[in-house]
Regions:
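Fe-S-dependent hydro-lyases/dehydratases of central metabolism
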Residues: 1-425
């Protein structure tokens, strides 16, 4: 199927988040006479303590923070303990996307607390059902050149827009909200040059799976991965989101992309054209490590149980029976991902011994699936449609049956993560 058959960037509709106002626009970037790559430019622009020497400790100014409901409660309690009146970041957002099942009063009570805390401290608040934090944040608040830290490991997804986005602990987020720097060890910058064009049926997920096939789940530790090269022209901003998101599975500190025409087009499509600022590596900029990927040589890949690093060609897994298929996560959040599944299933019925679970990644994606006719195709085929949120990715429902294979578009398949102790994902 051609990659451009359906779009992957819906326009946002009003009401996705409730907060004090729009994110500020462009900010001036630091400049230097030395040729710098994108990661170095981001670090230099936010450096408030230390020097950019690999292995040394530095302090970075934090522009934005992200918390979700599984980690945000402790962050809000920490802010209360500090006696903070209002957050001191450019913006901070509290999302509710994890603990969505309400089998007793605990989760809804927690959501009410988070909403009141967001109002008290001056955060934006995104309520249950609005969607997964990472694609929603990219659409609503992400901007090239900014720093973002979040109490969620996949915060790094925002690197798709040319941001320095890092997943950290809750206390670090609370300190940043209070106006304190983020302290990190200067990482190595790993330049990954992309060339060629993606074949049909090969996607951005296969790019990061190829990295995992080569380097495993700890290959990026202590490093920022920066993608560059003429192959970037093949990747939309949402494609880049997939790759940056799964930098977490590589163990990377962060993943960054340049802010180029693809990012300009994306921000224009989501109604925030004024947030764009070009950010690209200087001519002659170098990297601590280098890698090359010829996109033309890639084939569809899959991570077998039970590690994201256990990557093989899909052909090697052909013929294996599955009893559950789950589509929708921060690692495939675009409209196109769902539309392709719907078009494959149009006029067909799901096998009676297979459950297809669909998690729209945002309220906007769900709305576009409805207006585009794709949701009807999925429902007619026998799919189960769930609310917008993390859901099965974190074992919040959708646990697979014992001894059966579950095929998922999610970023992780570590043992038991699905909610079934002896799972096969």
């Amino acid at each position: 199927m051609a990659r451009d058959r359906v779009p992957d960037v819906p326009d946002p509709s009003p009401g996705a988040t409730d907060g004090p106002g729009d994110a500020p626009g462009d900010r001036p970037m630091a400049h230097t006479d030395r040729a710098m790559n994108v990661a170095q430019k981001l670090i230099a622009a936010h450096l408030v303590e230390g020097e950019m020497t690999p292995g040394s400790e530095i302090g970075l100014r934090v522009d934005q923070t992200l918390t979700q409901d599984a980690t945000g409660t402790m962050v809000m309690l920490e802010l209360e303990a500090m006696g903070l009146e209002r957050v001191r970041t450019e913006l901070s957002v509290q999302y509710v996307d994890h603990n969505l099942l309400q089998t007793d009063e605990k989760n809804p009570d927690d959501h009410l607390f988070l909403a009141s805390a967001a109002q008290r401290f001056g955060l934006w608040f995104s309520k249950a059902g609005n969607g997964v934090s990472h694609p929603v944040h990219q659409a609503r608040f992400g901007r090239p050149g900014a720093t973002l830290i979040g109490s969620d490991s996949h915060t790094c997804a925002a690197g798709a827009l040319g941001m320095l986005a890092i997943g950290v602990g809750g206390l670090e987020v609370a300190m940043a909200m209070a106006g304190q720097p983020l302290y990190i060890t200067v990482p190595e910058i790993w330049g990954v040059e992309l060339s060629g064009t993606l074949p049909d049926w090969v996607s951005a997920k296969d790019v990061v799976l190829e990295m995992l096939r080569r380097h495993g789940v700890s290959g990026g530790a202590g490093r920022i991965i920066e993608y560059h090269g003429e192959g970037l022209a093949q990747l939309t901003a949402m494609d880049r989101h997939v790759i940056a998101n799964m930098g977490a599975e590589l163990g990377a500190t962060a993943t960054v992309f340049p802010a180029d025409d693809a990012v300009r087009q994306y921000l224009g499509a989501v109604g925030r054209a004024d947030a764009f600022e070009a950010l690209e590596a200087d001519e002659g900029a170098g990297y601590d490590l280098t890698e090359q990927i010829d996109l033309s040589s890639l084939e569809p890949l899959i991570a077998r149980p039970s590690s994201p690093g256990n990557v093989v060609p899909v052909a090697d897994a052909a013929g294996e029976e599955v009893s559950q298929v789950v589509v929708g996560s921060s690692a495939n959040p675009g409209l196109r991902d769902f539309a392709v599944v719907a078009e494959i299933l149009q006029g067909r019925q799901i096998h009676p011994q297979v459950s297809l679970d669909v998690n729209p990644t945002s309220r906007e994606v769900l709305a576009y699936l409805i207006t585009g006719g794709w949701l009807g195709m999925l429902v007619a085929s026998g799919a189960r449609i769930h609310q917008s949120g993390c859901m099965g990715c974190i074992g919040m429902g959708q646990a697979p049956a014992t001894g059966r294979n579950s095929l998922r578009t999610m970023p992780r398949n570590f043992p038991g993560r699905s909610g079934t102790e002896e799972d096969s994902v």
